[in-house]
Each structure stands twice: as C-alpha cells, then as structure tokens.
Amino acid sequence: MVALFAALVYRVAAGNPGAGLVNAVRAKRAPAAPDMRFKVIWPHFETWPVKLRAAAEQGTLALSALRGYPVVLNFWASWCTPCEREAGLLAAAAKAKRGRVVFLGVDVHDFSGDARRFLGRHRVPFVAVGSGNSTSDRFGLVGLPETFYLDRHGRIRGMTRGQLSAAALRSQIEVAARG
C-alpha cells in the first residue's frame, strides 16, 4: 500500500503525461482516445455486437476497432475495493445496453490469474484486456477505478474517477451515445 501511495505521489509531483487528455475531457473538448492495442484476457462477448467479436477473437484488440459504437472503458484491478463494488453495476449495465454500447474492462497492474478470477466471480459479460504502464500514463490515470466514455467516433465525451454510481453511469452513457 505504501508503494502504491508513493507511486501516486511521484506521478503527481512529476506530472502525468495524460494530464492534457484529462484536462481536455474536463473542458468538454472531446479529445480522441489514444489508439492502443491490448492483450485480451477475458474473451466474453455476451453483450458485444456480433460484428465486433472478430476484432478481439485473435487475442489482441485495438481500441480503434470499436469505432461505430459508444464505449464504456473501465480501468480496474482485482485488488481494488471500489472496483469490486462497482463490478456488478457494470455487468448489469452491459446486459441492459447489449449490442448498443460496448463495455471494455482494462485491467491495470494486476496478475492475469487474479484478474480472471475477479472477472469470473463477478460474471463479467464483456471483454476485458490487460494493460501496462503506458496505458495508465496515456489516459492520465491517477487511481482506480476510472471510467472513460467514448462516442462512436472514438472521442472521449466524459470520465468518472472513483467508484461509479448508477446515475453517473447512465448519464455518461447517454452523453457518449449522443456524441
């Protein structure tokens, strides 16, 4: 825990490379999401549109492959207590928006076995990917969970830092879907 706090303090003191992205989102400038390629760790397509499934079935997924749909991009870890508390909300929302909104979980700083156990325990019905430090940096993450809402053009329309509420998730999805 001390190491995580020290890393957070260092990141804040040194300047976060993704701070510009976060500032643009907060200013409602709808910046383009960084196009990154992720390793798929949880290939569950229950709530994904059929035509997107091929994008992740080969074991990697480019974020740009999801264009054409609003995306809820949730950064989490198995050891994160607020992530644990919001997992059921995300699973239920993904089922309710099945085929219309793409949910993608991004596991951060975790062991893949721990991540898969977390996903199975919460019966997550959408694809999850693993990430590295560059992902955290490029998105300007300062803690977990963090959720970004992309419109169908891959532009970030909103974000939530910390545990989601049902109302915040619902309203942010509506904003992304209109964008």
How would you label these PLM feature ranges?
Residues E84-H122, G130-R138, S171:
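Structural microenvironment flanking redox-active thiols in thiol-disulfide oxidoreductases
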Residues W42, E57-Q58, H153:
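Residue-level recognition of short loop/turn positions
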Residues R67-Y69, G99, V124, L141:
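Active-site acidic short loop of glycosyltransferases
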